[in-house]
Amino acid sequence: SQIPAGFFIAKKGIRGMVALSIFGFSAFTWLMGTATSVLGLKFIRLGLGLTEGPCPVGLASTINNWFPPREKATATGVYIAATMFAPILVPPLAVWIAMTWGWRWVFFSFAIPGLVIAVLWYLLVRTRPSESAFVSKAELETITVGQETPDARRENIVISPGFARLDRLIRVRDLAPVSTVKGLFTSKNILGDCLAYFMMVSVLYGLLTWIPLYLVKEKGFTFMSMGLVASMPCIGGFIGAIFGGYVSDKLLGRRRKPTMMFTAISTVLMMVIMLNIPQSTVAVCVGLFFVGLCLNIGWPAFTAYGMAVADSKTYPIAASIINSGGNLGGFVSPMLAGFLLDKTGSFNSVFIYFGVCAAIGLFVIMLLDEPK
């Protein structure tokens, strides 16, 4: 549902689509609490995915419209960090709700805030700052500075002699923003970002899916002790996303590729470490923390990169292409990791697979151009 949503948002704006998406997946969350059969639950889950799909595209487009170039990666990092914080906070809260009021109330309780937020979004949020009654003239000038001229895209990065060597390495190019749908689907930079994101999301979702079993079967953790340890990648990811967005914006002059490259390289190294990590609770906790940290330092840049390649009108479609690639990786990777585990009986093959994904991601990232 993401690519159709991207086309809709590009034409009609974020206000209605994002509100409808939040309302839709909140309603399906409520319906899960009413399910009486496995088949019914499957159909509800399908509806949940279809209605949830447009939301990331709309949120990324909101950041693109509402933040100046110097803050886009930082804003994206905060948004991504929130998605890392939720898996830390929600599981114990869900257990408490289930133990107190029953499992159905877990779904009812999490649906209600979403329904309220959907209404508030529609009432308060506008597609562009210029359409909002809450934005002052000074704020509007800060957000849109340099974006009203044809040469605006030349200001994507901060040009400085100190970055000369880095700029050669990351292939800084003077590129015109992609302004057509055909241009997006034939852009090596958009498609390359999509493929690299596919590879890195494959690692993240594969880890989140299989880490609990790895801890219990391979490292001998009990189910009680496994909970905190399994959350370490999310804790590291929360810190990494905010830090990575800040570094990309403030320390690297809005360059996106360096943090993307760091994430790919460090993830390969962390997979090697995980292959040889000792049977120690502290070592496993530290290892998983740094896996999440390294993975997420470059995460904001994968989204912010498309903001520099596409223009503001086509970016929702660009975001939908990139996010669809990531979601496909999140769909394929857990199954392939499970297949490898069945065939080899060892988690070493799974970590090798994740390392290969990160290495392929690095190769693709190196081929991308950094828009000047």
Give the ranges of each region predicted by the language model.
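Extracytoplasmic gate region of multi-pass secondary transporters
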Residues: 175-242, 299, 303, 333
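Cytoplasmic helix-loop-helix junction between adjacent transmembrane helices
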Residues: 44-83
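Conserved MFS/SLC helix-loop-helix module at the cytosolic interface between two early adjacent transmembrane helices
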Residues: 1-39
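Helix-to-loop junctions at the C-terminal end of transmembrane segments
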Residues: 1-13, 242-254, 341-342
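Cytoplasmic membrane-interface "Motif A"-like loop-to-helix N-cap segments
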Residues: 11-22, 249-264
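C-terminal ends and interior cores of transmembrane alpha-helices
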Residues: 23-36, 265-279
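Helix-loop-helix hairpin linking two adjacent transmembrane segments in secondary transporters
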Residues: 79-133
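Helix-breaking motifs and short loop linkers at transmembrane-helix boundaries and internal kinks
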Residues: 13, 34-40, 51, 67-68, ...
